[in-house]
Amino acid sequence: MNISLGLVVICLLWQRDIRQWVTLAGHPLVWLPALMFVLLALSLLTHAHAYGPKMVGKYQKLLYVLPLALFFLAAPRLMTHFVRGFLWANAVILAISLTSGLGHVTLGGLNPDNPTVFKLQITQNVFMALAALVWLSRAFACSGKRRWGYAGLVLLATLNVLLMVQGRTGYVALAVGMGVWLLLTLRRKQQMAVLACGILAIVMLVMTPNRAMERLSLGVQQIQGCIWAPAETAYQACDNSMGQRTAFAREALRLIQQSPLLGNGAGSFWYGNPSTGYGVHNPHNEYLLETVQSGLLGLMVFLTWMWSCYRAAWRLPPAHRNLFVAVLSSYMACHLFNSFLLDSSEGHLFVIIAALLAGLSLNAQQPQRTSPQT
């Protein structure tokens, strides 16, 4: 990442139109994430946590918004290339995952019971949910065979997320993203029809044994078991996916009470068992992680960045607006269960999304600036 950042600086210096990158540097979508990084880096001067430098390094990706937005401004076709590449990659992953899950193929270490192809199951399910959302928007925009093709991809991706790959965060991304997009796109009567179909689908999922409901029920049981466990057996009772997230939240709230305004510094969160050597520095909740490390000040900067993303998305043409708002809403919901800005793949994807929004918002403002002169 350090080499990449150095190359980015060279590209910035090579950029001859100094006014363009100065304008971008003053854009809230660019300087707010940079401020988040600066707050985290400055905490190294006042707090000494062993994991602090590594945590700051993981958030270095927040500095990439400016150069990426410059690239998108210099060559708008890169936006199309990125979206196309994202969709093609997910289509290939979907094909391999379906082949493994339905055909019980174990080649290359694939597990038919959890056919994860790309990185971790959470990452694949979230990315597949976002791809399904884009395919859904294209199904509505196209006609004829292309509409049916995109509709088929939406159906297969939805089945893959809900019934095959074991990543509950993907359920959240899919439900929130599609729900927001349909709410913004459809007319009132169409919304009621989709709502009725959604309720029917939920009833069928609840009444019919399936992996999605099994995973959701297990998650609820894990949370309850962790909450009600006595102190002597609390660590063992919380030693599972949702139980650990519950324990993470408890520890995070304790740390926030110690230093609510400015936080405890980078790398201050830790949960584990010293006797076994197990420990994590990630509470799996971006809101809690920001508050623990940078305090309420850092949380406000983070939320202001998210609000600025929504504001920039809302000013785009309806088709782009609805899609970006839906994607942002998916991320906001998933931040409750994972620290997506900390995670590599999910964090880099959001940085690219922020850069896309920054580039599109400046492109939309340029005609307004030049119109008085003509």
Q: How does the language model describe each region?
A:
Residues 1-42, 50, 74-80, 84, ...:
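Transmembrane signal-anchor hairpin modules in multi-pass inner-membrane enzymes, especially those
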Residues 5-13, 171-183, 197-201, 307, ...:
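Hydrophobic transmembrane alpha-helices of multi-pass, membrane-embedded glycosylation machinery
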Residues 183, 190, 293-330:
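Hydrophobic transmembrane alpha-helices and their immediate junctions
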Residues 234-294:
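Long extracytoplasmic/lumenal interhelical loops at the membrane interface
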Residues 6-12, 324-334, 341-374:
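Transmembrane alpha-helices of multi-pass inner-membrane enzymes
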Residues 28-38, 50-73, 81, 85, ...:
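Aromatic-anchored transmembrane helix interface
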Residues 9, 78-109, 119-186, 194, ...:
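Alpha-helical transmembrane segments of multi-pass inner-membrane proteins
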Residues 185-234, 250-258:
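A membrane-periplasm/extracellular boundary helix in multi-pass inner-membrane enzymes
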